[in-house]
Amino acid sequence: MNVTGLYLIVAAIGIVLALIAYLRNRNNIGGIIIGFSLMEIVIMAVIGVINGVLGTPNAMLGRLFMTFSGSYGFLAFAAICGFFYISGPLAAYIIRKPGAATIAETMNGVAQVLSGNPNGVMVLGAGFLQGFMSDMAFAFYGYKNWTLPVVALSGALAPLLQQIPEVYFFGVGDMGLGYNLVALAIRMVSGAVYAVVLVRPIARGLARAGVVRGTAVAAEEGKARLHGQVA
């Protein structure tokens, strides 16, 4: 198997996962398209823009790795890619509606382009793919399971399709099958780790501060606080 074959399989896996998510939610398909409140739209935009603006220096650091680290540069870059994937799981965890991760990550891509990301307009597509696959993790559970393992899965799935265009953009397709598998694995682990470490603490901190009033996570935090007072 060559690298092209590998990424055809990866793309097929992504499509199958999306199909499974659809089938698991097909009986509630009427509720899948849910409108967002103005506050939720603002939250998704702000999360995406902040992560995107901060992601541009991260991308520059990745370029530095690839310039001075030779064949290991892309792998080193993969280890910090989890930062790019945070806006999807974070927005989804706060809002808890289908599409929140996709919208936030797409806004992330827009912000990266406007803030001078050295990788150019490619990051727009990358942002959409990251968010779409992040959404799939929550879709598997009907957008009803918001536990830490599912948050980790959301971060891990983000690069599954996103790495495909980047491999050809950065020209590492010729590095071989094993190299590309390792790069994908590192990105998935990085996505999971960043999600586990950052998503819930940030979301709960924002809820306690009253910044995300009217969202699902704010309601959950309010109930937890009330329960603690009653206890």
Where are the regions that the model predicts?
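Membrane-helix interfacial "entry" motifs
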Residues: 32, 36, 40, 73, ...
